Structures are given as C-alpha cells and as structure tokens.
Amino acid sequence: MNPGTTNFVHGFPFVAISLGLIYKKRPVLGVIYNPFLDYLYTGIKGHGSHLSKNKNPPQKLPLSTPRPLPSLSQALIAVEWGSDRSQTVAGSKAESFLRLAGDPNHTSPVKGGRMAHSLRSMGSAALNFSMVAQGGMDMYWYVIAHLMFAPLYEGLLCAGK
C-alpha cells in the first residue's frame, strides 16, 4: 500500500508506516502511523479501531457518528493517481474521476457524471483508508486499471470479505 513516499520526499506531512497481520488467511491486526502528525491508527479483530493522537489516550473510531449518505452529491471522496502514469492507467483513472465528479446536468454535461461533492488526493493510500475510518472522508475510490491483478491487491490491502 502506498505510504506517501512522494509526500515524504517533498516534506508534505501525509506519510504513513502501515502494517497488517493476516492469521489463517484472515486479517486480524492493522496499524497505520503518521510520524509527522503523531497519529497512530490501530485495528484489532474483536476490539475495534482506535486513533491515538500525540501520545493521548486512544479514541474509538469513527470519531463521530457517521451521517447517512443519501447520494454521491454529498460525499467527500478520497482518490489517488498513483505512480503509474502510463496512458492505460492514467486514462482509466482520469475517466473514472471525471465520471465521479462530473455534472450530468451542466450545459456541457459529463456523460455518466455523478457530481460527487468533492474529491481529495492525500497522496497516501494508507492515510486515505484511515480518514475513512476516522469519519473525515466518506469513501476511498480505488481504481484498479489492470483487473487481472485485483486478487493480488486484495491481499496487499488485507481485505476481508
């Protein structure tokens, strides 16, 4: 999972160290740490997820009760361009992001547009997932341009079923 290497090189403080533990083919533990902000996200199967900020006691996630999300037009969505900027990958992502953010009712409409409230790119997949867990973002729109690798990505993300 992208920890925000480019962010680190540029001194942008959205960087993470992320670890996941799978036991008997099941995710049981996840840890994401942002050393610049001193935020530690933890998730332990059967014990929930927590955020510890600046050495303070852990807070249960999400930090606030999630509000109902009736449509994408009210959603704050995390997206990432990634490091593969080939025509195939960048083109797939650009098309997906355009449909996600585009206005289908504009005088120059975006075909298939869903008019999401806003898209954000933090530069770290690990922190995007953390912000969703925290309640700071509504979802992470993860585009896999090469679908033949989808099972591999599932394992890398410690995804459960």
Which residues make up each language-model segment?
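IMPase-like, lithium-sensitive Mg2+-dependent phosphomonoesterase catalytic core
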Residues: 1-161
